[in-house]
């Protein structure tokens, strides 16, 4: 019996978190006019079991840590307003307090992917460069050997 209640609570908080993520993404994209925030992606939302708090994991496509911190501070200062906008869209008795947290995993993943792509491209360039040089060296060596073989066979006749 206790297990079923716990499972239902978890699924409800997860459903609320998913809906909150969707609503936050729409509000931040359409309704927020603050130029300090710019383009923001809501990666995940983690709602507490009592629905009093929600950790909102966001990403800005910026590499400069100072700019990221400014954007995060702008979101944090706008959190009560954002909460009000989202509360109007969701039918909850208690609207969780929003706590914005910068999530660098997406940016780090993109950075790692770019590094891997660069290494692959450099490796291909080296293979083409050395591969064509090796082929020309092989042609020269084989060409000389073939010519030597031809000379030897002509001399035997």
UniProtKB/Swiss-Prot annotation:
Stretches with biased composition (Acidic residues): 135-157
GO MF entries: ribosomal small subunit binding
UniProt region (Disordered), positions on chain: 127-157
Keyword terms: Cytoplasm, Ribosome biogenesis
Pfam families named in the record: RBFA
Cellular component, GO annotation: cytosol
Localization per Swiss-Prot or TrEMBL: Cytoplasm
GO BP terms, alphabetized: maturation of SSU-rRNA
Database matches in NCBIfam families: rbfA (TIGR00082)
Role according to the record: One of several proteins that assist in the late maturation steps of the functional core of the 30S ribosomal subunit. Associates with free 30S ribosomal subunits (but not with 30S subunits that are part of 70S ribosomes or polysomes). Required for efficient processing of 16S rRNA. May interact with the 5'-terminal helix region of 16S rRNA.
Subunit structure: Monomer. Binds 30S ribosomal subunits, but not 50S ribosomal subunits or 70S ribosomes.
Record-stated family: Belongs to the RbfA family.
Name of this chain's protein: Ribosome-binding factor A
Organism: Shewanella baltica (strain OS155 / ATCC BAA-1091)
Taxonomy of the source species: Bacteria, Pseudomonadati, Pseudomonadota, Gammaproteobacteria, Alteromonadales
Gene: rbfA
């Amino acid at each position: 019996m206790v297990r079923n209640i716990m499972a239902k609570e978890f699924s409800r908080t997860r459903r609320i978190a998913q809906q909150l993520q969707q609503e936050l993404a729409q509000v931040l994209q359409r309704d927020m006019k603050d130029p300090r925030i710019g383009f923001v992606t809501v990666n995940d939302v983690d709602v507490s079991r009592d629905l009093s708090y929600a950790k909102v994991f966001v990403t800005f496509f910026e590499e400069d840590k100072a700019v990221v911190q400014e954007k995060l501070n702008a979101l944090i200062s706008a959190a009560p307003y954002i909460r009000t906008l989202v509360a109007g869209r969701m039918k909850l008795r208690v609207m969780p307090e929003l706590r914005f947290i910068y999530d660098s995993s997406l940016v780090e993943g993109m950075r790692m992917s770019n590094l891997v792509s660069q290494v692959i491209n450099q490796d291909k360039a080296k293979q083409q460069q050395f591969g064509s040089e090796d082929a020309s060296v092989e042609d020269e060596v084989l060409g000389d050997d073939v010519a030597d073989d031809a000379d030897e066979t002509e001399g035997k006749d």
